């Protein structure tokens, strides 16, 4: 007894020592981190004190000593960065000495990304280790064991080495996966090898069901009508009516869950995988034997492996079935036309079929083999009903069977034959533990609520009613598949529409998926760039798809036709945009002025909300505690008003009360997310106001144009001239001072004129001396006045004469002086016999510079001529 009691004490002491060691390591790590942060801050301060490029750095760098020191420092820093990154398993791409700052920045950012990625990988590995979701340990073959046993220190050192070199280990695993993928290459499509036909046309889907097993008799004399008020079924077309016709619709609607499935029963433990027999079904005889076996059991688990990339409609590659005692794997390729005989056990309402995530499996069985399911239990639906944190099959198996599933072949190409042992084991594990998991889920549902189990069966039956529909080509389907990063013009839209149609036609003809023929990003790149030749097409498609290379001429023809389309920038209509958003499930809520005013996130007028803190608290102290509705004017926010933790007494009252559905809170939170803020309301109001003002302005302009009151702003030479009114000085307030002739104070004033005399009187004359010529005359009149002043100048134009003989006081303008007759007999005719004066001697005040130049040239010519004649003047 003393020895047994000492063992727990030793274990407790050892655990305390481990905790103390972990605490010390944590404190040491924190000190190191703080030291690194302090050193980093000092490094930043020191680096800020260095000369800056573009300021003093060039001046300092002109000295050889500084230049040499900087190069050596750069080499030392590069070596340190390389050493640090290598020590943590992320070698850095160190730049050469003298590289630009941009190059250094790029290398440092790349190193930071690698370090962050490695840290995330290690963190994920630690989280999986806590949840026991680690990679399965391979089975070791028993051999001669070494005599020397490794100590705990050596084991911990080996683990640290593995942690430090995790990148190398992952690279090795990737290399092994590439080798396995090379061995699993499918040289020929199963559709050709096994002569599997598929209908890829636009025709509606027709069921492959040949014999309807377990059919119920239809009651005669009962007619069901499901029409609208007008008596017509306008909402169902002939095509949808054919496709939506489920062969077992009556059997599923009248299905009642057997009483044994609604009661508690013993959970039958599964047998070990290696102790369970496995049968491969690849012939018709084996398939018939399997059908008899399934008809004799009460329940079995089913799972499918599917391939979508190299088939237009898809291809079921493997069917896994597990009973309580045996596992079966069906290879459907050799017996494709005979798998339909499984419809007998699958449609039997007395046999339970257990699936996990059966929404797609049910449709694939209908499409390929004509097999329909009745009496289904979906473990995924049950996990959702029990509100598990995860809903995957791996989590379900880990929770109940304590087995970690290896999901490395989840996305493998299941068309490859022969199947590898690892792939066979992966397929077995998907159904081997499913029946035991069903037992555990059933008991938990019954323990939670008896209605929950019935609800799971009801929701599973809704999945069975689903009918497979063939994909119908939509000319505008690319709007839902492709996320655009730019606005399409008419040419790009033409190219994208026709490439999308061409891809669908080729995929249907060759039985390939549209994405295999031409991926979305390549189709978008071709439509955006519109290459002119084959080389441009190949540049947009990298790596080059097989059918693009084979049918380059068709693609080039579409692009050439797109280039001939008239170039216009068009956008999506509101209907097309809404249809695309609805197809993606991102339908935006329309918000008008009234709803934006009524719905607001921060309207707390009906609640006891603390506006100073600015928060709404939801009590999460107890997951099962119901939230009580408050009768504060029936406000939507009333359920969110409890900001303090309730007391124990309050919690007891709530627990004893009627439990409300927690979905109400989620629904209200979703409603709150749709509400708009006051600033968003203000923005919407401003946009509406701007639109209204713009419409009013356009309407006013339209009315003015119709009425002809809009003043003319553009003129041409055909328009009549406009008399410019003189500008008056605002300081001249007395109109009498502007009169040309002042009034005589001695003259008696005239009596007031009559209205007739006032209307016939002449307009008042103003004194023009109070205005400048620029204010009274136009530009042309000013030019004429300057020309006249230049012609009628009073300065003498003859050198030597003091003034003109004419007296300016006696000179009158042509307008004022009367025209007199000239008597030529009295004129002095000797005036015409005088010699002509020199034109250069005339005085022209506007051309004096030309006169001086000519005079200078003339004097220089006279000097040269005198020098040639030898006349030299000497000074006495």
From Swiss-Prot:
<dbReference type="InterPro" id="IPR012588">
    <property type="entry name" value="Exosome-assoc_fac_Rrp6_N"/>
</dbReference>
<dbReference type="GO" id="GO:0071036">
    <property type="term" value="P:nuclear polyadenylation-dependent snoRNA catabolic process"/>
</dbReference>
<feature type="compositionally biased region" description="Basic residues">
    <location>
        <begin position="848"/>
        <end position="861"/>
    </location>
</feature>
<feature type="region of interest" description="Disordered">
    <location>
        <begin position="1"/>
        <end position="22"/>
    </location>
</feature>
<keyword id="KW-0540">Nuclease</keyword>
<keyword id="KW-0053">Apoptosis</keyword>
<dbReference type="InterPro" id="IPR002121">
    <property type="entry name" value="HRDC_dom"/>
</dbReference>
<dbReference type="GO" id="GO:0000166">
    <property type="term" value="F:nucleotide binding"/>
</dbReference>
<feature type="binding site">
    <location>
        <position position="361"/>
    </location>
    <ligand>
        <name>Mg(2+) 1</name>
    </ligand>
</feature>
<feature type="binding site">
    <location>
        <position position="305"/>
    </location>
    <ligand>
        <name>Mg(2+) 2</name>
    </ligand>
</feature>
<dbReference type="GO" id="GO:0006309">
    <property type="term" value="P:apoptotic DNA fragmentation"/>
</dbReference>
<dbReference type="GO" id="GO:0071039">
    <property type="term" value="P:nuclear polyadenylation-dependent CUT catabolic process"/>
</dbReference>
<keyword id="KW-0269">Exonuclease</keyword>
<feature type="domain" description="3'-5' exonuclease">
    <location>
        <begin position="279"/>
        <end position="445"/>
    </location>
</feature>
<keyword id="KW-0271">Exosome</keyword>
<dbReference type="InterPro" id="IPR049559">
    <property type="entry name" value="Rrp6p-like_exo"/>
</dbReference>
<feature type="binding site">
    <location>
        <position position="303"/>
    </location>
    <ligand>
        <name>Mg(2+) 2</name>
    </ligand>
</feature>
<dbReference type="InterPro" id="IPR010997">
    <property type="entry name" value="HRDC-like_sf"/>
</dbReference>
<dbReference type="GO" id="GO:0000467">
    <property type="term" value="P:exonucleolytic trimming to generate mature 3'-end of 5.8S rRNA from tricistronic rRNA transcript (SSU-rRNA, 5.8S rRNA, LSU-rRNA)"/>
</dbReference>
<comment type="similarity">
    <text>Belongs to the exosome component 10/RRP6 family.</text>
</comment>
<feature type="compositionally biased region" description="Basic and acidic residues">
    <location>
        <begin position="834"/>
        <end position="847"/>
    </location>
</feature>
<dbReference type="GO" id="GO:0071044">
    <property type="term" value="P:histone mRNA catabolic process"/>
</dbReference>
<dbReference type="GO" id="GO:0000175">
    <property type="term" value="F:3'-5'-RNA exonuclease activity"/>
</dbReference>
<keyword id="KW-0698">rRNA processing</keyword>
<keyword id="KW-0539">Nucleus</keyword>
<dbReference type="GO" id="GO:0000178">
    <property type="term" value="C:exosome (RNase complex)"/>
</dbReference>
<dbReference type="GO" id="GO:0005730">
    <property type="term" value="C:nucleolus"/>
</dbReference>
<comment type="subunit">
    <text>Component of the RNA exosome complex. Interacts with crn-5.</text>
</comment>
<dbReference type="InterPro" id="IPR044876">
    <property type="entry name" value="HRDC_dom_sf"/>
</dbReference>
<protein>
    <recommendedName>
        <fullName>Exosome complex component 10 homolog</fullName>
        <ecNumber>3.1.13.-</ecNumber>
    </recommendedName>
</protein>
<dbReference type="GO" id="GO:0006396">
    <property type="term" value="P:RNA processing"/>
</dbReference>
<dbReference type="GO" id="GO:0071035">
    <property type="term" value="P:nuclear polyadenylation-dependent rRNA catabolic process"/>
</dbReference>
<dbReference type="InterPro" id="IPR036397">
    <property type="entry name" value="RNaseH_sf"/>
</dbReference>
<feature type="binding site">
    <location>
        <position position="430"/>
    </location>
    <ligand>
        <name>Mg(2+) 2</name>
    </ligand>
</feature>
<comment type="function">
    <text>Catalytic component of the RNA exosome complex which has 3'-&gt;5' exoribonuclease activity and participates in a multitude of cellular RNA processing and degradation events. Involved in apoptotic DNA degradation. Involved in regulation of antisense ribosomal siRNA production. Involved in response to cold-warm shock.</text>
</comment>
<dbReference type="Pfam" id="PF08066">
    <property type="entry name" value="PMC2NT"/>
</dbReference>
<dbReference type="InterPro" id="IPR045092">
    <property type="entry name" value="Rrp6-like"/>
</dbReference>
<dbReference type="GO" id="GO:0003727">
    <property type="term" value="F:single-stranded RNA binding"/>
</dbReference>
<dbReference type="GO" id="GO:0043277">
    <property type="term" value="P:apoptotic cell clearance"/>
</dbReference>
<dbReference type="InterPro" id="IPR012337">
    <property type="entry name" value="RNaseH-like_sf"/>
</dbReference>
<dbReference type="GO" id="GO:0071040">
    <property type="term" value="P:nuclear polyadenylation-dependent antisense transcript catabolic process"/>
</dbReference>
<dbReference type="GO" id="GO:0000176">
    <property type="term" value="C:nuclear exosome (RNase complex)"/>
</dbReference>
């Amino acid at each position: 007894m003393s020895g047994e009691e000492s063992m727990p004490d030793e274990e407790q002491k050892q655990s305390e020592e481990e905790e103390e060691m972990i605490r010390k390591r944590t404190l040491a790590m924190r000190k190191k981190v703080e030291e690194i942060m302090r050193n980093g801050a000092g490094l930043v301060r020191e680096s800020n004190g260095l000369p800056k490029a573009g300021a003093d750095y060039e001046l300092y760098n002109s000295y050889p000593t500084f230049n040499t020191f900087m190069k050596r420092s750069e080499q030392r820093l590069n070596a340190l960065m390389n050493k640090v990154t290598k020590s943590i398993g992320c070698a850095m791409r160190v730049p050469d000495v003298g590289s630009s700052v941009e190059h250094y920045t790029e290398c440092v950012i790349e190193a930071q990304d690698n370090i962050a990625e490695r840290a995330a990988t290690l963190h994920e590995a630690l989280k999986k280790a806590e949840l026991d979701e680690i990679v399965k340990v391979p089975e070791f073959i028993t051999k001669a064991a070494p005599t020397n046993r490794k100590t705990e220190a050596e084991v911990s050192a080996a683990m640290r080495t593995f942690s430090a070199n995790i990148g190398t280990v992952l690279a090795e695993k990737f290399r092994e996966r590439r080798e396995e993928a090379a061995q699993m290459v499918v040289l020929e499509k199963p559709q050709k090898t096994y002569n599997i036909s598929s209908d890829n046309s636009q025709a509606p889907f027709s069921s492959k069901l040949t014999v309807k097993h377990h059919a119920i008799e239809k009651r005669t004399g009962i007619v069901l009508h499901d029409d609208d008020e007008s008596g017509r079924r306008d909402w169902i077309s002939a095509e949808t009516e054919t496709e939506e016709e489920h062969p077992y619709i009556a059997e599923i609607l009248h299905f009642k869950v057997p009483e044994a499935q609604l009661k508690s029963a013993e959970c039958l433990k599964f047998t070990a995988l290696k102790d369970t027999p496995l049968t491969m079904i690849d012939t018709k005889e084996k398939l018939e034997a399997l059908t008899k076996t399934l008809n004799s059991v009460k329940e079995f688990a089913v799972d499918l492996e599917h391939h979508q990339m190299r088939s237009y409609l898809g291809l079921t590659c493997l069917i896994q079935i597990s009973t309580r005692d045996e596992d079966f794997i069906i290879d459907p390729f050799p017996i494709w036309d005979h798998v339909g005989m499984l419809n007998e056990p699958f449609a039997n309402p007395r046999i339970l079929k257990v699936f996990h995530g059966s929404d797609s499996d049910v449709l694939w069985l209908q499409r390929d083999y004509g097999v329909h399911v009745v009496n289904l239990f979906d473990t995924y639906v049950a996990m959702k009903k029990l509100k598990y944190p995860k809903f995957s099959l791996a989590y379900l198996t880990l929770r109940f069977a304590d087995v970690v599933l290896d999901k490395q072949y989840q996305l493998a190409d299941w068309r490859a034959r022969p199947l590898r042992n690892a792939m066979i084991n992966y397929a077995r594990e998907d159904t081997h533990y499913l029946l035991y998991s069903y037992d555990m889920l059933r008991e938990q549902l019954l323990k939670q609520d008896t209605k929950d189990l019935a609800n799971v069966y009801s929701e599973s039956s809704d999945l069975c009613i689903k009918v497979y529909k063939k994909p119908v080509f939509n000319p505008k389907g690319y709007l839902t598949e492709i996320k655009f990063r730019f606005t399409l013009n008419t040419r790009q839209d033409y190219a994208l529409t026709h490439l999308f149609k061409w891809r669908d036609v080729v995929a249907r003809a060759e039985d390939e998926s549209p994405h295999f023929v031409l991926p979305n990003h390549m189709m978008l790149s071709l439509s955006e760039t519109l290459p002119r030749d084959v080389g441009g097409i190949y540049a947009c498609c990298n790596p080059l798809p097989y059918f693009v290379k084979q049918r380059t001429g068709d693609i080039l023809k579409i692009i050439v036709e797109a280039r001939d389309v008239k170039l216009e920038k068009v956008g999506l209509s509101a209907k097309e945009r809404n249809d695309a958003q609805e197809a993606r499930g991102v339908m935006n809520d329309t918000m008008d002025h009234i709803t934006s005013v009524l719905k607001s996130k921060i309207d707390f007028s009906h609640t006891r909300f603390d506006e100073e803190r600015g928060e709404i608290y939801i009590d999460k102290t107890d997951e099962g505690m119901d939230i009580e509705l408050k009768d504060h004017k029936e406000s939507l926010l009333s359920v969110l008003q409890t900001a303090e933790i309730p007391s124990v007494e309050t919690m007891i009252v709530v627990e004893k009360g009627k439990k409300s559905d927690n979905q109400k809170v989620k629904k209200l939170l979703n409603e709150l997310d749709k509400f708009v803020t006051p600033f968003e309301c203000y923005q919407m109001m401003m946009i509406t106001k701007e639109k209204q003002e713009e419409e009013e302005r356009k309407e006013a302009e339209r009315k003015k144009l119709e009425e002809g009151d809009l003043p003319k702003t553009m003129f041409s030479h055909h328009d009549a001239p406009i008399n410019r009114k003189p500008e008056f000085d605002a300081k001249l307030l007395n109109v009498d001072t502007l009169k040309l002739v002042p009034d005589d104070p001695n003259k008696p004033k005239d009596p007031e004129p009559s209205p007739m005399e006032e209307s016939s009187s002449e307009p008042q004359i103003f004194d023009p001396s109070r205005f400048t010529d620029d204010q009274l005359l136009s530009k042309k009149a000013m030019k004429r006045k300057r020309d006249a002043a230049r012609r009628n100048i009073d300065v003498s134009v003859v050198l030597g004469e003091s003034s003109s003989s004419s007296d300016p006081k006696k000179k009158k303008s042509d307008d004022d002086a009367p025209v007199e007759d000239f008597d030529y007999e009295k004129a002095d005719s000797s005036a015409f016999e005088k010699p002509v004066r020199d034109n250069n001697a005339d005085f022209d005040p506007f051309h004096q510079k030309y006169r001086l130049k000519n005079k200078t040239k003339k004097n220089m010519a006279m000097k040269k001529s005198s020098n040639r004649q030898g006349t030299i003047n000497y000074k006495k």
